[in-house]
Amino acid sequence: MIGPISQINISGGLSEKETSSLISNEELKNIITQLETDISDGSWFHKNYSRMDVEVMPALVIQANNKYPEMNLNLVTSPLDLSIEIKNVIENGVRSSRFIINMGEGGIHFSVIDYKHINGKTSLILFEPANFNSMGPAMLAIRTKTAIERYQLPDCHFSMVEMDIQRSSSECGIFSFALAKKLYIERDSLLKIHEDNIKGILSDGENPLPHDKLDPYLPVTFYKHTQGKKRLNEYLNTNPQGVGTVVNKKNETIVNRFDNNKSIVDGKELSVSVHKKRIAEYKTLLKV
């Protein structure tokens, strides 16, 4: 069995042997087989994988930190713990870090926070893969904002932005994990959004930045797993240079990639890409 999330050391730095102890190979193989079956028979959109992602997330975070030590990825199981985690990275002189944050109190929603320390100032940007019209994202955002304000971190600038790329009900965890990795890989492209956050240009600090205002800040690679074609087209209308940009090792453009992962669900074109991403990430945890 996978250990309860609250009992796992999630700050990173565990060895491969310790990582493997979080989940048995046999259990993981069974999970992966079922995930692949769900994609094959088309039931993936109507399945709920939230609890599974909550349980596997600690192992994924440890694996990511072992592969990318400078990623500084942290898993925070409740917004109540976020401020002390941020304080720790500041005091340790960390200039850049990411926090995958869970709702806590038995909740299942995830978002991801990108942290940068620039000229003595702290910039925190919460990236919501869905939108803030839903209860889960709204509650997590409120709890996170309240926790940061309560701790009164010095010279700290916090904004919330919505990506609105998630359409299925239970993929916030794997979206947040994929975004965390992208925030690290594309870190040099994110300087402007953090500078604008510190200047107060990005948002007023009270209201989230809507997706159409966020789109100009982000490279097309952030939208690889966008589930809806309409949403992808909105991004490309704002960023036409992204249409011809190759986004992966298969030499696919973002539109090629969507078409190659397209599935018709309830009469709508939806991408199964993020579900395949979950399988790929779970497979990295398998031990020979």
UniProtKB/Swiss-Prot annotation:
It is found in: Secreted. The active site is at H109, E128, C172. Its cofactor is 1D-myo-inositol hexakisphosphate. It is an enzyme of class 2 (transferase). GO terms for biological process: negative regulation of JNK cascade; negative regulation of MAPK cascade; negative regulation of p38MAPK cascade; peptidyl-serine O-acetylation; peptidyl-threonine O-acetylation. 1D-myo-inositol hexakisphosphate binds at K182, L183, Y184, I185, K224, H225, R257. One of its GO terms (molecular function) is O-acetyltransferase activity. InterPro entries: YopJ-like. It catalyses: L-threonyl-[protein] + acetyl-CoA = O-acetyl-L-threonyl-[protein] + CoA; L-seryl-[protein] + acetyl-CoA = O-acetyl-L-seryl-[protein] + CoA. CoA binds at H109, R167, S168, Q227, G228, K229, K230, D266, G267, K268, E269, L270. Its EC number is 2.3.1.-. Keywords: Acyltransferase, Allosteric enzyme, Plasmid, Secreted, Transferase, Virulence. It holds the Pfam family Acetyltransf_14. GO terms for cellular component: extracellular region. 1D-myo-inositol hexakisphosphate activates protein-acetyltransferase activity via an allosteric mechanism: 1D-myo-inositol hexakisphosphate-binding induces a conformational rearrangement that stimulates the interaction with acetyl-CoA. Changing C172A: Abolished ability to inhibit the MAP kinase kinase (MAPKK) pathway and promote virulence. NCBIfam families: PRK15371.1, YopJ_YopP_only. Belongs to the acetyltransferase YopJ family. Serine/threonine-protein acetyltransferase translocated into infected cells, which inhibits the host immune response and induces cell death by mediating acetylation of target proteins. Inhibits the MAPK and NF-kappa-B signaling pathways by acetylating protein-kinases such as MAP2K1, MAP2K6, MAP3K7/TAK1 and I-kappa-B kinase (CHUK/IKKA and IKBKB) on serine and threonine residues critical for their activation by phosphorylation, thereby preventing protein-kinase activation. This is Serine/threonine-protein acetyltransferase YopJ. It comes from Yersinia pseudotuberculosis.
